[in-house]
Amino acid sequence: MKTLLLTLVVVTIVCLDLGYTLKCNKLVPLFYKTCPAGKNLCYKMFMVATPKVPVKRGCIDVCPKNSALVKYVCCNTDRCN
């Protein structure tokens, strides 16, 4: 009985994420990265002239301001970028 209980505890720890970690897409959305502590936003950067083609994606702590040439879209759920 103790072995079964210990096994269930180990499986629970392995299956559950003990601390919430955000996952953000890399430039190619098939791949993603787990964000380090403090980086709690995903972002997508693209040129204003070509809004359908992202230039960069990843994790960030604060969403940058848009400029005349570059636009940022930020979000805070897994793989939302």
UniProtKB/Swiss-Prot annotation:
Q: Which residues form each disulfide bond in the chain?
A: 24-42, 35-59, 63-74, 75-80
Q: Cite the entry's keywords alphabetically.
A: Cardiotoxin, Cytolysis, Disulfide bond, Membrane, Secreted, Signal, Target cell membrane, Target membrane, Toxin
Identify the stretch annotated as signal peptide in this record. Answer: 1-21
Alphabetically, the GO molecular function entries are:
toxin activity
Localization: Secreted; Target cell membrane
Q: Where expressed (tissue)?
A: Expressed by the venom gland.
| Bilayer-crossing regions | none
Taking the first listed entry, what is the main subcellular location of this protein, grouped into a coarse class? secreted
An example of a Pfam family matching this protein is Toxin_cobra-type
Q: Please indicate which superkingdom the organism of origin belongs to.
A: Eukaryota
**Gene Ontology biological-process annotations:** killing of cells of another organism
Q: Which GO terms describe its cellular component?
A: extracellular region; membrane; other organism cell membrane
Q: Which family is it part of?
A: Belongs to the three-finger toxin family. Short-chain subfamily. Type IA cytotoxin sub-subfamily.
Subunit and partners: Monomer in solution; Homodimer and oligomer in the presence of negatively charged lipids forming a pore with a size ranging between 20 and 30 Angstroms.
Function field: Shows cytolytic activity on many different cells by forming pore in lipid membranes. In vivo, increases heart rate or kills the animal by cardiac arrest. In addition, it binds to heparin with high affinity, interacts with Kv channel-interacting protein 1 (KCNIP1) in a calcium-independent manner, and binds to integrin alpha-V/beta-3 (ITGAV/ITGB3) with moderate affinity.
Question: Which protein is depicted?
Answer: Cytotoxin 3b
